């Protein structure tokens, strides 16, 4: 079985796909990742083969991303998905994914839900396709109905010679796999029957990370705002606010800022704060007493799976949805407004001293442990292929 997995660059996009890629590899399937060239470092670190397609023209996305940090959440999501993902990125990706399919001849195409070119290429070539959800499925489906996103996708279909699909019937009919828990979904929104949820079984390592604080028993606070925020006008302000919040607290704080930034850009930090570009989150979560984050779906899912209570400061995209659900689940605190050291400090203090928050996170962790392991998804993919061949 040959499986082409398509993705955008960035940990928030690639990360939720990797459990499925590794599960397929363990089952001796041939797997090829098709992603922008800028994803090469992350893909190769996973020892997965990469078909690199062209990044969008330099600077084409910069103005939009710079503006996103200044937009209210209800506008930032459709702007990113419609203007960037469904127009700029998908237009750049389509030729490369098409070339990968023609040269490598996969049996099936699997695409994360914000990588729109992969399913369109599969449709054009008559290949079966599967989506891998990286955001809340109900809320994501609702966003797809925004005028900005609908227009972008219909323009894309017309550009590549595909029939119109104004109601997204083809997209909704695709099987959808995910490691995101149902607890993150808005209970007021119906879930498609095609959704199948699994639990990730992380390969946790131990390394120099813990040598930084040998003998220090103070609780560990993990601070991360994802891989996109460092590329926007939110850097360095939001990071500095979080660092200032914990500097005088009796905690250890690990801050990650992404591979595109230098820790020196944040200026001096107190001795209880460690700033790194990148640390595998699976290595951090088992030791974290609390987390301060942006509310990215991957980060929130990993934190909940480990039972880590969190303070969520949503910045853009799907993050306000996740902040709201974390608070509703009793697994953390949703922060609103501009980044404020005092507000972050108060939230962290509550997470560390009020057991109810850890209890809420652990309840979700128990629900996630009851899901089938991600290796079970291999059987789903094989059954889909058999159904296609039998049709």
Residue positions per predicted region:
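A short, active-site helix/loop in glycosyltransferases that binds the activated sugar's phosphate group
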Residues: 157-193
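Conserved nucleotide-sugar donor-interacting segment of glycosyltransferase catalytic cores
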Residues: 82-160, 164
């Amino acid at each position: 079985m040959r499986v082409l997995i398509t993705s955008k660059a960035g940990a928030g996009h690639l990360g939720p796909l990797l459990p499925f890629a590794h599960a397929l590899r363990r089952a001796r399937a041939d797997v090829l990742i098709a992603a922008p060239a800028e994803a090469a470092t992350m893909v190769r670190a996973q020892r997965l083969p990469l078909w690199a397609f062209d990044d969008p023209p330099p600077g084409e996305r910069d103005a939009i991303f710079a503006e996103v940090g200044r937009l209210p959440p209800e506008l930032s999501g459709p702007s990113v998905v419609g203007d960037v993902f469904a127009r700029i990125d998908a237009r750049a990706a389509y030729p490369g994914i098409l070339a990968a399919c023609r040269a490598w001849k996969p049996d099936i195409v699997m695409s994360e839900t914000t990588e729109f070119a992969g399913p369109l290429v599969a449709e054009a070539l008559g290949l079966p396709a599967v989506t891998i959800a990286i955001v809340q499925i109900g809320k994501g489906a609702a966003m797809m109905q925004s005028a900005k996103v609908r227009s972008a996708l219909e323009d894309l279909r017309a550009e590549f010679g595909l029939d119109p699909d104004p109601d997204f019937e083809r997209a909704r009919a695709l099987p959808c796999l995910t490691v995101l828990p149902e607890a993150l979904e808005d209970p007021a929104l119906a879930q498609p029957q095609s959704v199948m949820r699994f639990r990730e079984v992380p390969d946790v390592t131990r390394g120099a990370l813990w040598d930084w604080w040998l003998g220090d028993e103070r609780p560990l606070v993990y601070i991360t705002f994802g891989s996109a925020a460092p590329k926007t006008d939110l850097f360095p302000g939001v990071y500095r606010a979080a660092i200032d919040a914990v500097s005088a607290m009796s905690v250890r704080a690990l801050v990650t800022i992404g591979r595109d930034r230098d820790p020196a850009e944040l200026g001096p930090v107190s001795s209880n704060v460690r700033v790194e570009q990148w640390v595998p989150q699976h290595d951090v979560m088992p030791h974290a007493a609390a987390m301060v984050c942006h509310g990215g779906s991957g980060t929130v899912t990993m934190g909940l799976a480990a039972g880590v209570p969190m303070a969520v400061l949503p910045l853009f995209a799907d993050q306000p949805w996740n902040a709201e659900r974390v608070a509703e689940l009793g697994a953390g605190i949703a922060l609103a407004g501009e980044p404020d050291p005092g507000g972050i400090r108060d939230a962290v203090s509550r997470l560390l001293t009020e057991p109810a928050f850890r209890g809420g996170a652990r309840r979700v962790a128990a629900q996630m442990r009851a899901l089938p392991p991600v290796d079970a998804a291999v059987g789903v993919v094989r059954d889909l292929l058999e159904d296609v061949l039998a049709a």
